[in-house]
């Protein structure tokens, strides 16, 4: 066991040291190759851990890893709220609040809260513990794309607000697509990150259907405020339908926990 782990750690050390050397040389040479070489070097570096783990998995803590990634997700979602509220505060200072802006704020809040719920609806720690280290790389690297998609949601909300304030000169369809596309991508990625058995793959399909509905709203070309609100309502509807369809207790316990009392436990008189 320890021999395998020793080989793994040596591969880690050699691979990461080599990549650091390449990064330094690339920087000293004036970053030749531009963005293309940058992406290639990034891919090489993220390939080092999977290559090293082929010799034997190092000890790791699934719950801790899930917590770290989850906290980063919350931070990115918080940045979306921060950017939106910052833009709205400027508008309030200028005294130009309108119905479209109010719908944008409400829709933006619904989108953020629903994305939070979609991400935390399953236990990531349980999946990591049951699947092992190798699938965890796919799960972990998949978060890179998820973080980018969530950050793009904040940018899309900013574009919609700028269009309503006549700061950004793009069409309503372009503005809502700048929001709808990253929301749809985030939904698909969350469905993929959760998918590990039949039940969760069903959820992944549901997430894909919700993403399709979001894109339809974005393509409709309505005013940005209305579109943002409708996208938020689409997510809420998907959430409610999921809860009603998968949680029988919502219908089976209309009178609270006292319905489960047996005759022996029921109070006399």
Q: Could you describe each region identified by the protein language model?
A:
Residues 1-3, 268-269:
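Accessible peptide chain termini
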Residues 3-36, 43-215, 221, 235-260:
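Predominantly late transmembrane helices and immediately cytosolic-facing juxtamembrane segments
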Residues 222-229:
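Hydrophobic alpha-helical transmembrane segments of integral membrane proteins
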Residues 229-235:
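Signature aromatic-anchored transmembrane alpha helix within multi-pass, membrane-resident enzymes
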Residues 257-269:
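Long, low-complexity, intrinsically disordered cytosolic termini of multi-pass membrane proteins
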